[in-house]
Amino acid sequence: MDTLDELLPREKMLRSGIASLSDVELLALFLRTGTPGKDVMTLAKEILQHFGSLYGLLSADFAQFRGVNGIGLAKFAQLKGIAELARRYYSVRMNEESALLSPEMTREFLQSQLTGEEREIFLVIFLDVQHRVLQHSRLFSGTLNHVEVHPREIVREAIKLNASAVILAHNHPSGCAEPSKADKLITERVIKCCQFMDIRVLDHLIIGRGEYVSFAERGWI
């Protein structure tokens, strides 16, 4: 039987919509049950306080979860499943909707793909002449603070797909999204390499912990 604490977030969602739930209520809705002597709302509040935010929670590994009372393997699996569902949702949405509808959608997709990665990943979205998504690929992976990017490989893949434009993105596992000098230099190299084949670089987004930097928004592209 559902407890009162379990029903409260559910009834609020049905009455006012899922967006009306606080982070604690949303987490409680997914956890469903508390632990002996601790209701689910209290457990959800303590978990969020421990990790600082939903981002910190969903990007944590099992070793970090084990330090929280009430979080076992089952609840860890539930929460990691939520993060993976979000990642797959945005991936499918990009493929099915075919076009980048807005900068916000692009950012949300890239955050879903790159947030929580422990190494730097360089991802490229390939677009046709109408800016419809042809493919998105993780072309390069690196270390905690560096990824080797080869502009010619980006151009080669774009030509193979008959792409007329690309959006570049990579993550900073450190959490700070501010671009380094190396980030700016590689962006310039990719732009120059693409220009030879009449391929436009629309943006380069750097994804940090709960933040991002868009080269286009800053007027660098």
From Swiss-Prot:
Gene3D superfamilies: Cytidine Deaminase, domain 2 (3.40.140.10). A motif (JAMM motif) lies at residues 170-183. Keywords: Hydrolase, Metal-binding, Metalloprotease, Protease, Zinc. InterPro entries: MPN, RadC_JAB, RuvA_2-like, UPF0758, UPF0758_CS, UPF0758_N, UPF0758_YicR. Zn(2+) binds at H170, H172, D183. Pfam families: RadC, UPF0758_N. GO terms for biological process: proteolysis. Residues 99-221 form the MPN domain. CDD domains: MPN_DUF2466. It comes from the Bacteria. One of its GO terms (molecular function) is metal ion binding. Belongs to the UPF0758 family. YicR subfamily. This is UPF0758 protein YicR. It comes from Salmonella paratyphi A (strain AKU_12601).
